[in-house]
Each structure stands twice: as C-alpha cells, then as structure tokens.
Amino acid sequence: PDTNTNTESCENTSIDNLQKCDLKHDNLDRYYYIYIPENLDNNSSIPVLFALHGYGSSAYRHFSYTNYIPIADSNNLVIIYPQGATTDTLSSHWNVGGWTSKSTVKDIEFIDTLINFTKNKIMIDETRIYSSGMSNGGYMSYHLACNLGEKFAAIASITGSMTNGTYDDCSPSHPTPVLQIHGLLDYVVPYDGNAGSKSIPDVIDYWVNYNSCSSDPDRLIKYSNDFDLILYDTYINCLN
C-alpha cells in the first residue's frame, strides 16, 4: 500500500507567520514548520531555505535559536524547519548513513516531498533552494547536495561533516557553493574526523576539487586575541 499521502494539514502557531504542518511519509507521521513573511512579494523571486536541526534536537528549538526571521523578512525568503524522525535506536535525527546507519528513515525523499508541497502553494524560485544545518543537520545538508543536488543551489554546514558513505558515494548534479563553519576543539564532530566522519579538510578539499576552485584560499583573520582565532577562508574562481 501507498505509505505516503499527497496532502498535508497546516495550522497557525502562536508566532506570527509561522505554521506547523503535519503529513505522513513512508508510513511515519512527520511534520515541519514553515515561516512565510507577512509581506511576501509574490511578484519577485522567492527563495527557500531548509533549516535542519541537530541530533536529538527539534525543529521548533532550531527555529528559536537560529533567529532567521529578520533575514527572511528582509530578503523575501521562505524558511522550512523540518522535524527529524525518532526510531527505536535513535533520537530525532537525519538519516545520513554512517553513524545513523541503523536508521531506515527516507529523509532524502521526505525533504523532496516538502519541496513539492511548498512549490504547490507558493511560487518559489526552484533555482534558489538552499539547505543549512547544525551538526547532524549539517551532515544532512551535505547528504542532500550529494543525493538531491538537482534541487539545491547551495548548502551550509555548521559543525557538521560528511559520513564516509556520503563522501564515497557523493554524486552532485552541478557545482555547488558550500559554507562550512567548524571549531578546532569540537569533540562531538571532530575537526580531524573519526571512524564515522571525514575530516573537515577532507570535506573542503572534496568540494574545492569538485567545484574546480583555486586550491589556495583567500584567508581573512576575522577575529584574534590571546585565546581565540577565527579564520575565514574563501576559495575563488569556482565553476559556480
């Protein structure tokens, strides 16, 4: 039997312009939040940003601390906050293989379904769909670029990485701009990688090579004192 539905049920929340939508996907009850600016200009390009929470977190918590509302309001931007699934072995998560390999949740298809729902009710610019994610959500952003790349223009990963499986099987459909934000002292997703994740330099090298960027970055020291150093590397002359 068909375990997906072609309909969703949305309701307003206590926050202006934020709706919660429920649907069934692959026989699982799933939901997401969608923020649609009150003064959305339907006569101009409407980009969409997927904002993906970290492992064990939630869509609403991610909405609360990312504070994307001012960005959405000033850029005619629709933001979607999907909720990861919970299974018998995993808390709320995104199935990216590797350390989530016990999961059977079809998250790539779930995100694709949300794109279809969104474009059926809003005249979005399908060439300007983006994904950003925190930790496990960052892994998922890379997973989407590798496996649903035809739908995503660019992605961002904050403290995420690529699992070995995502890295080895990555098949992007076009040169893809990537933003990676990471701390050298991150012990949850180590900068130098571990048995289940690629190192951040390996991840950056993959996309630099795939996008045919200059191999040496332009480096800007954004902040420095006796205790901290923030480096901002930009790879230029890329294909996209």
Where are these regions (language model features)?
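Short beta-strand/loop motif that positions the catalytic acidic residue
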Residues: 180-182, 186
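A domain-start/cap signature at the N-terminus of enzymes
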Residues: 1-48, 63, 74, 103, ...
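Short, proline-enriched alpha-helix->beta-strand connector loops that line the catalytic pocket
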Residues: 173-178, 238-240
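Alpha/beta-hydrolase fold nucleophile elbow
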Residues: 123-135
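Alpha/beta-hydrolase active-site loop
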Residues: 100-122, 143
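Conserved alpha/beta-hydrolase "acid-adjacent" motif
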Residues: 187-199
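Short substrate-entry loop that stabilizes the transition state in hydrolases
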Residues: 40-90, 164-165, 188-190
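Cap/lid segment of the alpha/beta-hydrolase catalytic domain
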Residues: 83-106
